[in-house]
């Protein structure tokens, strides 16, 4: 595989299969038959992850048949005290098939996540159209705490050190990328 110009891993031995990067229950969108599997490791409190979410939304609109996006949590607890709780809340939203709505609302309300009040997660659940009783039963009891940790450990094993980190068909690219950079990588992979 050709090396990308935007700081990717350069040797083919460092390619990681999608099977190792993602699990069947990870939030995903895009066709299963897509030529490109894009695995994202992200943190809901990371400003670069927030910036990237809007760019990736545009990318998926431009390449709806070519990219399957898979989301993995990588809460950077050392600097984002509510990132892990946000990831758990996202998993509870995914349980109701509303992950992407909740994902978008979390990023829209990112500054409120710095608050010491976990009620923001319940407000966002309501705003995203989740069943509040189901969400409370899930989030209030930490149902997905271990799953979030599994995502994090999968990221560590794959060499993720910060967010966002992307894997394009197994090739790692770190950091917030411009739409133009994303498109260059996608075009290279579609050749």
Where do the language-model regions lie?
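Extracytoplasmic thiol/disulfide redox context detector
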Residues: 1-78, 137, 144-162, 185-191
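Cysteine-centric redox/oxidoreductase cores and disulfide-bonded domains
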Residues: 2-5, 76-163, 167-191
């Amino acid at each position: 595989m050709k090396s990308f110009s935007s700081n990717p891993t350069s040797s083919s031995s460092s390619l990681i299969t999608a099977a190792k990067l993602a699990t069947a229950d990870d939030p995903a969108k895009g066709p299963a038959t897509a030529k490109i599997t894009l695995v994202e490791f992200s943190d809901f409190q990371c400003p670069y992850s927030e910036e990237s979410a809007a760019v990736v939304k545009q990318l998926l609109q431009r390449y709806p048949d070519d990219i399957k996006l898979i989301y993995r949590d990588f809460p950077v607890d050392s600097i984002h005290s509510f990132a892990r709780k946000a990831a758990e809340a996202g998993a509870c939203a995914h349980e109701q098939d509303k992950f992407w709505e909740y994902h978008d609302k979390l990023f829209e309300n990112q500054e409120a996540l710095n608050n010491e009040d976990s009620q923001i997660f319940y407000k966002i659940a309501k705003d995203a159209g989740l069943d509040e009783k189901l969400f409370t039963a899930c989030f209030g009891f930490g149902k997905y705490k271990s799953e979030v940790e599994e995502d994090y450990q999968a990221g560590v094993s794959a060499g993720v050190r910060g967010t966002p980190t992307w894997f394009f068909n197994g090739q790692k690219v770190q950091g917030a990328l411009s739409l133009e950079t994303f498109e260059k990588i996608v075009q290279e992979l579609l050749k």
